[in-house]
Amino acid sequence: GLFVGHHIAALQIEKAAGVKMAYIPNKSGGSGAMKAVIAGEVMAGVNNLSDAFRAREAGTIKILGVADLERNAFMEDVPTMMEQGLDVDNASVNFRGVMVPKGTPQAIIDKLAETVPAMFANGRVAGKMKAGGSPMHIMTRDEVLAMWAAREVTLKDLLAGL
């Protein structure tokens, strides 16, 4: 979809490489886009690593690079885009978070901020994430707020004129 992680990464790659890629919407989302790459219907694709991980394990694709600041812990042989000379950071990385409605008492927000990271440290949760090729990057509330402030600057520049 427009302005989701895949699109942001593609825009960053275009800008860094000085190229223009064709944007081909897919009604089936990331899984449909991955199928198009595997079938040779498109020359390449920008997908979530969790989708690409499974296709790579099956031997149907080669992952050329990751749009992140560091290599993926489960695919350490795949370089980052920056390592390959492309100015592509982690602005497209899809993070998951816990949200509450506006007006939620601060005591509840503080309790969630204190306890949620431990939930993700659970071995069962970590194992499921690893099986899907998604290493966890557990962040505090303050780290998330700082990350979004930095991303806002990057995205405003990247999306200007679209």
Regions found by a protein language model. Give the residues of each.
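Conserved, function-defining micro-sites of small-solute handling proteins
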Residues: 1-162
